[in-house]
Design a protein with these regions (language model features):
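Short loop/turn segments that connect beta-strands within beta-propeller blades
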Residues: 26-29, 79-83, 129-133
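Blade-loop segments of beta-propeller domains
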Residues: 28-68
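Beta-propeller domains
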Residues: 8-40, 180-182
Length: 185
């Protein structure tokens, strides 16, 4: 099943468990390719495009994918329709987090959002979107609590899978809402 989903131009990128990426040409309504993202063995809950490109020759802007199980990292990829290369990992080093993390990018505002569990509450924190130049010698960025631009309790969001953020508005698909809308009236 699809965990994360992002669209850029005429292409849809459907992310599945353990890093499987399925690319669909929306204009021609056909499958383009499927492959495993470099290094991502997680659940791929969210997928987003940023604004920076790895190089002038890059087919797409950098592609951000949540790895929510193991490292709780955001994997940043230079992606094409033929494959992807891991170019950066983003971590939050706050010790207060007790559960999985999910990441989503607001490209319009150049921010990255982190859904996390602190104690028994879900929180949303946001940070300036790191650039590739911010990486250390291992290709990693480690965000700290003091780097946050803000944070709010996120309420009863059990699973932020499939989130999309655009200009400070978060779009979240909630299973109960989908079930309610699909019920005959």
């Amino acid at each position: 099943t699809t965990q994360g989903f992002a669209i850029y131009g005429r292409y849809a990128f459907s992310m599945h468990d353990k890093g499987q990426c399925v690319i669909i040409d929306l204009k021609r309504n056909r499958l383009v390719n499927t492959f495993i993202l470099d290094g991502n063995t997680g659940h791929c809950n969210n997928a987003s495009f940023g604004v920076e490109r790895y190089s002038r020759k890059s087919q797409f802007p950098l592609f951000y994918v949540t790895e929510c199980r193991g490292e709780r990292a955001c994997y940043v990829n230079d992606i094409t329709t033929e494959g992807a290369r891991l170019v950066q990992k983003i971590f939050y080093d706050g010790e207060e987090i007790t559960g999985p993390c999910d990441w989503a990018v607001d490209a319009a505002r150049k921010r990255i959002y982190l859904y996390c569990t602190i104690g028994s509450l879900r929180w949303l924190k946001w940070f300036p979107l790191p650039q590739l130049a911010d990486s250390d010698d291992k290709g990693e960025v480690h965000l700290q609590a003091e780097d946050a631009l803000g944070s709010i309790p996120a309420g009863d969001i059990a699973i932020p899978q499939g989130s999309h953020i655009y200009k400070d508005v978060i779009f979240l698909m909630m299973q109960n809402l989908v079930q309610q809308l699909s019920q005959p009236r």
